[in-house]
Amino acid sequence: MKKGESPEKVLFIAGHEFLYNPQNGGQQCSLRNYNLLKSIFGDNNVYLCMFSNYRYEHLNSNEKIFPTHKNFLELLIDTISGRNVCGRKSRKKAIEFINSLNVDIIFCDSSIIGKILRDIKISGVRIVFFHNIEKNYAKNKVLHDNFGYLIPYFSYSCNERQAVASADYCVFLNDRDRKEAEELYGTQKSYILPITFEDAYVEKTKDFSDRIRPVLLFVGSMFAPNISGIKWFVEEVMPELDDFVLYIVGKNMENRKKELERDNVKVIGTVEDLSVYYNLADAVIMPIFFGNGMKVKTAEAMMYGKTTFATQEALEGYDIESVRDRGIYECNTKEEFVEKIRKNVSVHSTINQQVRQIFLEKYETGVQEKKFQSFLMRCIKEHGRDAETME
């Protein structure tokens, strides 16, 4: 089957904005999923239903955007009512649009809109993608960030359970999430689609030869696990690495400059081009101690072939055994970070080809596309047989 010639039709339901300037890991993963489906089935055969308040000047005829909450009060009322991404009117219009379609696959790119999936009347194999186990995500927010997340905790849990009940297949980023979903909701048919990137590595020619100290890099947005982890690293590890310099890059991290910056810690924050900093860095650090799903920045660092020092949580879902302690180093304590960084990082460290090769073999999007296509075709075939049996 050639790309663009597929007769199958697909509906992609997104619970959040991801087309306009995707920056966080969830948005990047949603865009990856959407582009994968368009690559497999053809642009004209994939319908989009997305909840967003961004005003697009142009949309294709098969792309529909429905408004989400306008303010915090609407968000609170709707979440209490179990409507996590939109109000009653927007939900009704979205379901009307969905029910007007004739598709072979309903791909729900969020497990927190299970009630919408439940109320869809059209046929087609139903696949739910789990960015993480949202119930556990909300639990972590309650424990580490804000008690106000108790309301989403119950709403997410209810919708997630309904999503599993309404799905024919569930897709997870890693085996940990699959096992947790099975324990919580009794999921049966599943597939693992890990975080991937299209290979965008281009070595920059800028000369950094005047550097004296080795450069460490942390990339992450102003998100609770990132803040907690990098704050710990700056306070506990960097005083022991006074002959190193750490750059902190990521959306809105400049807001934490006063709190985090030291003589050997430079807070850059939001940047247009991350590749400049990846090419500058001798190594990447990922001190993430709690979270869910897979960490997108781990795959990104691998794409750039960076020697990486990361916690078990930051490496969750990644097969790194062939480069363990030969390019990717697991560190879970202050002592492990200090010892392994000192032993394995120097000024002007070159690209680690072994780390980059693992990315190209396992986490480059094209490598996973053929496997994912086979899974989707199998889903359609099995769903068709089930429908014939019911008749």
Feature map (PLM): residue ranges:
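Donor nucleotide-sugar binding/catalytic pocket of nucleotide-sugar-dependent glycosyltransferases
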Residues: R161, A165-E203
